[in-house]
Structures are given as C-alpha cells and as structure tokens.
A protein has these predicted regions:
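Glycine-rich phosphate-binding loop of nucleotide-binding enzymes
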Residues: 1-56
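P-loop NTPase motor core of the ASCE superfamily
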Residues: 73-128, 274-392
Length: 392
C-alpha cells in the first residue's frame, strides 16, 4: 500500500521481476500500464515465447467459459466460484443476496452440472446454463410442493438481468468462449483492463474471469510457485457479495503453492471496507507499506486495521525521513506476520529504472526509439542508460 508518487509501481516491478527470475508464474491484473515495460522486456528476451500483454478493448475483449473443464470434474470450490460469478452478474453491489437466492442458484448450478455430465452432447457454456434455468429449472420451481415465493427467489428477474450475457445479448461474448484463456505455458502475463474500470457491470465480471483463469492454472501446475497480483482492480471485488469469493480465492491460492498480492494507493478504500478487512487483510501474512506521510492524520486507523505494533508504526513513519541525498532510492517497509519487520531501500540500475518507469515522457521516449530499432526495447534501454551515465 502506498499513495501516488511513493514508488509503489517501481517497487512492484522490482519485486515481480525477481519472482519471475526465480521461476515463478506471474499473472497481473492492472489498470494503468504499470508493467508494460517489464512485460515487453520479457517478451523480447524470450523471443515472444513469454511476456503476454492482454489489453481489454471492444474489438478484442477478454472472454472465457466458466463451465469448461478438461475432465468434467467440478469440486465444491469450483461450483461455489461459478455461483458467485452468477450472483455478480445478477445483483448490483448494493443488493443483498439472501440465503434462498444463494441456495437456489447453488442448486441450479449443481443440477446443470449433473445434466452436462450425463449428456455430453450439451456444450457446457453460459448459453446452455441460461436455457436450462429458463426452460427446466423455472418449470421445476413452479411444480414444487413447497412453493418458493418470488420475493425469496425471483427467477424471472434473474433471467431478465442475465439476458445481456446470453446469445445475441450485448455481452454474449463474455462467458461463452470456445477457446479458454490458456495461461499454463506462459510465465508472465499482464491483463490491462483500464478501459473498463468505470463500467460497473463489466469490471467485476472481467476481474473474476481473470482470477478464475488463474485458479484453473494453479490447479493444473504442480510444484511451481504461482503469483496473482491485482492492482486497483481489487475494488471491483470489494462489495459484500464478493466476500465469500475472496475468501475462497485466498484459501485456494495457499493450497496450490500460490500467492495473492493486492496493491492499492487509497487508504480510504481499505479503511471503509469491512470486506477488505475480513477477506484480504485477515488472510495476508505479509504487508508492504510505502511512504505514508500523506496519511499521517489517518494512521491510527491504518495501524488498528493492519494490527501494527508501536515498533512497526515507528518504522513505517520513518520511511524516507533520512535518505542519503547522494543516492537515488525510495524506502519501503516489509512486515511478516508480526514476527519480523524492517525498512528497506528500493535502489535500481539506470536500465531497471527505464524498464520500470511509469513517467509518461520517459515511456514515450523508450517506445519511440524502440520503433526505430525494430521493437528492440532492450537495446533502447541500454543506449538511454549509457547516455544518462555519461551526462552524470
């Protein structure tokens, strides 16, 4: 956590690069092109074999199939994640999900899965699930001896709301992909979804789609560290309806030798959200904070929320207070579950600086020169770094 200008993107680039070099599979969900330079470097280094940059656009949206599996095996967690996705499609952030709604949708998912297992001619997809709900589950509800009131579970309202994700609807591409996002063979993947961060319908759905793709990768990739980093996109998951999904994700990540990292700059987002406290902070043993001077007057709330000791508070408030003026670096505090903590300096070479920078003028210069050199970003960075050293 660090406010704008604290060196957060820089530190994260540095951290991620080291994870990657140690063999970790990294998946990033970003909303600001912070990792474009590093991703491009990896793509050049591997001759296009790695370093994949997905940018969400209307022409090339990110899509997947929540009902697809290689082997028709759906464990309890997979079924729960499908149910959570469907509730997200149906309900707005402020709508409270009742036990009946959650229970009925869970039962419908179960029954649909049994059907596609029994009849392999049915193509598992959101389209066929929607048809099952509309044609079969709705009829079965009406025929029950104990009636389910519309006020408890309004299936017509659900079908109407979800219609836009069904065949010929405006978002019919999202959940009916014939090709699934294949993350298995690539070790460094960035999903850039800045273009939809203001879209309250698409943003949470696409974020869940990416996280589901990551979880599918984790289940299949044994004995290798996997890392999911969610930048400001985590806000899409901070509604009360998402709490269960976040808990499920953290539990699953740990089980499969993975790490989930949430990156934020707005302290108010964290302080004001009980979901963040219950689902993210309580499941995070490692906490990393950058310069917090901007939030001095709110630091008691931060300390309470993160469960920091007085010693840890003093360490954090000392960040960048006595930096060596002859060196270029920014400090960062790392705390490990209350057992160990210290302040470190993020100090990088001129080459690393140019690969990590999010400064618009510097990025433009790097990419302009790369175009002239046939896309060789590494050669450009070496040239510019050498030029800077000569100036010094």
């Amino acid at each position: 956590m660090g406010p704008s200008g604290s060196g957060k993107s820089f530190f994260m680039n540095h951290l991620v690069r080291q994870y990657y070099e140690q063999g970790t599979h990294v998946v990033l969900v970003d909303t600001g092109n912070s990792y474009q330079g590093l991703c491009e470097m990896i793509r050049c280094k591997t001759n296009g074999a790695d370093g994949v940059y997905f940018t969400y656009t209307e022409e090339k949206p990110i899509s997947f199939n929540p009902f697809y599996t290689d082997d028709y095996v759906f464990d309890v967690e997979k079924k729960d994640s499908i149910k959570t996705l469907l509730l997200t499609l149906w309900k707005s952030e402020d709508d409270k999900v009742t036990k009946t709604e959650s229970g009925e949708l869970g039962s419908a998912v179960n029954a649909y899965i049994e059907r596609i297992r029994a009849d392999r001619s049915i193509v598992p997809s959101f389209n066929t699930f929607y048809e099952y709900m509309r044609d079969d589950y709705r009829r079965e509800l009406a025929e029950r001896e104990i009636k389910v009131e519309k006020s408890d579970f309004n299936i017509d309202n659900m079908l109407t709301t979800m219609r836009q994700y069904y065949r010929d609807g405006r978002y019919d591409f999202l959940l009916n992909s014939t090709e699934n996002i294949d993350l298995l063979g690539k070790r460094f993947i960035v999903f850039e979804i800045d273009s939809i961060k203001e879209n309250r319908e698409l943003f949470p759905v696409v974020t869940i789609i990416i996280m589901e793709a990551f979880i599918n990768k984790m289940r299949r990739l044994k004995g290798v560290r996997k890392q999911l980093i969610v930048e400001e996109a985590w806000k899409a998951l901070s509604s009360a309806n998402m709490a269960e999904y976040l808990r499920y994700m953290y539990k699953t990540v740990r089980k499969y030798y993975g790490e989930a990292i949430v990156v934020t700059q707005e302290v108010d987002d964290i302080i004001s959200s009980p979901v963040v406290k219950e689902s993210i902070i309580n499941n995070s043993d490692c906490k990393i904070l950058l310069d917090q001077r901007k939030y001095m007057n709110k630091f008691d709330a931060i300390q309470s929320l993160l469960g920091l000791t007085e010693k840890e508070k003093s360490q954090i408030l000392s960040i960048n207070m006595a930096n060596n003026p002859s060196r270029l670096y920014k400090e960062v505090w790392i705390g490990l579950g209350g057992t160990q903590s210290a302040v470190y300096a993020t100090e990088v070479s001129a080459e690393e600086y140019l690969a990590y920078t999010t400064e618009e003028t510097e990025k433009v210069e790097v990419y302009r020169l790369a175009e002239q050199l046939g896309g060789d970003i590494e050669a450009v960075i070496r040239q510019l770094a050498e030029r800077r050293r000569k100036k010094e």
